[in-house]
């Protein structure tokens, strides 16, 4: 039996060395070490041995099993290493090849402009307020001194959802909501950026959806000079320290007196050109002193409090600052346009 065990060992190790693939190794393992394998079959005959022979043959059998197992493990490891090397050779990466370009995105121009405006006014002590885009008729019109059937309502071409709900035509409702929430009990210094909607036909200067940012200050002894000073700071920070402003009389139901603000043309420095239509000035926003009736409806005593308000289109500010001639460029997602304004 001793010779038979050694013969099985030699045959098994030789077969393992000649194996060509993992399946062959698995078959050899079953052939020699399995429940019906050669080694197991020989060991079943140990019952016929004497007590003295059994320990000796048992030890030899264990050694043979360990030697066959070791041969199988070594061959398996060798095959796995060869397979890995072959795979790596096929998947070799040429590190000298140029990499794929990484396209770095940037903030949209409108986002940059509104953040710049917000930072400017936050630096002057303003809070940023927000409100719903689906607004009530009351806050969009009536609370702003635009009662039902007021002719100025027609100027805003409103998207109505129901008789009392609409898509806001301006961000002024946020001001009205804030004033009524404060109920005349404390001063206000706020700006409110956001989307607004009007039934305009889209063209180079109009859009059915655009963005506004409006400001409101209410306190004691606020005058038109405070508004002018604030807008002068805004114009110089946004368009350059050499820019000048002028205020022209206008009409807005929310304010009295009302003004429109022009800034000196950046292209011609106020001398007159095609951009400013030879006037030397470009209109950028409207504003005025908060109407006493609006103050009263919001709980503020107009004999004690006064305030100013202003509003501007973010797209218009961006167009003037960066020389964009068509508002539609902001919304078509043309990468050729957008990449012109990526910051380094």
Swiss-Prot record:
Cellular compartments annotated: Cytoplasm
Family matches, as InterPro entries: aa-tRNA-synth_II (IPR006195), aa-tRNA-synth_II/BPL/LPL (IPR045864), Phe-tRNA-synth_IIc_asu (IPR004529), Phe-tRNA_ligase_II_N (IPR004188), Phe_tRNA_ligase_alpha1_bac (IPR022911), Phenylalanyl-tRNA_Synthase (IPR002319), tRNA-bd_arm (IPR010978)
Name of the top EC class for this enzyme: ligase
Catalytic activity: tRNA(Phe) + L-phenylalanine + ATP = L-phenylalanyl-tRNA(Phe) + AMP + diphosphate + H(+)
Coiled-coil region(s): none
PROSITE patterns xrefs: AA_TRNA_LIGASE_II (PS50862)
Cofactor note: Binds 2 magnesium ions per tetramer.
SUPFAM superfamilies, per database record: Class II aaRS and biotin synthetases, tRNA-binding arm
One GO MF term: ATP binding
CDD domains: PheRS_alpha_core
Record keyword NAD present: no
NCBIfam families found in the cross-reference section: pheS
Family recorded in the similarity comment: Belongs to the class-II aminoacyl-tRNA synthetase family. Phe-tRNA synthetase alpha subunit type 1 subfamily.
UniProt protein name: Phenylalanine--tRNA ligase alpha subunit
Organism lineage string: Bacteria, Bacillati, Bacillota, Bacilli, Bacillales
């Amino acid at each position: 039996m001793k010779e038979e065990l050694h013969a099985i060992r030699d045959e098994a190790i030789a077969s393992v060395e000649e194996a060509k693939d993992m399946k062959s190794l698995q078959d050899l393992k079953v052939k020699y070490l399995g429940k019906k394998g050669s080694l197991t079959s020989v060991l079943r005959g140990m019952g016929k041995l004497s007590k003295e022979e059994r320990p000796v043959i048992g030890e030899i059998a264990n050694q043979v099993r360990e030697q066959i197992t070791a041969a199988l493990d070594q061959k398996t490891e060798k095959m796995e290493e060869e397979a890995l090397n072959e795979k790596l050779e096929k998947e070799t990466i040429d590190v000298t090849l140029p990499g794929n370009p990484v396209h770095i995105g940037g903030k949209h121009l409108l986002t940059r402009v509104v953040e710049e405006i917000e930072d400017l006014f936050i630096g002057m002590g303003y809070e940023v307020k927000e409100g719903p885009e689906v607004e009530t008729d009351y806050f969009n019109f009536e609370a702003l001194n635009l009662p039902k059937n007021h002719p100025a309502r027609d100027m805003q071409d409103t998207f109505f959802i129901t008789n009392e709900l609409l898509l806001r035509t301006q961000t002024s409702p946020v001001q009205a909501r804030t004033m009524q929430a404060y109920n005349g009990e404390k001063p206000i210094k706020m700006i409110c950026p956001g989307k607004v909607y009007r039934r305009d036909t889209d063209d180079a200067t109009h859009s059915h959806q655009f963005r506004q940012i409006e400001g409101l200050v209410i306190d004691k002894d606020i005058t038109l000079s405070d508004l002018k000073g604030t807008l002068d700071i805004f114009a110089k920070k946004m368009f350059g320290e050499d820019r000048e402003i002028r205020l022209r009389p206008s009409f807005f139901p929310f304010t009295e007196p009302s003004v429109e603000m022009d800034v000196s043309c950046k292209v011609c420095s106020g001398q007159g050109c095609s951009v400013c239509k030879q006037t030397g000035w470009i209109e950028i926003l409207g504003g005025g002193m908060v109407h006493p009736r609006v103050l009263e409806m919001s709980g503020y005593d107009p004999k004690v409090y006064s305030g100013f308000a202003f509003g501007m289109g973010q797209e218009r500010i961006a167009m003037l600052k960066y020389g964009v001639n068509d508002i539609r460029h902001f919304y078509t997602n043309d990468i050729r346009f957008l990449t012109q304004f990526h910051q380094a």
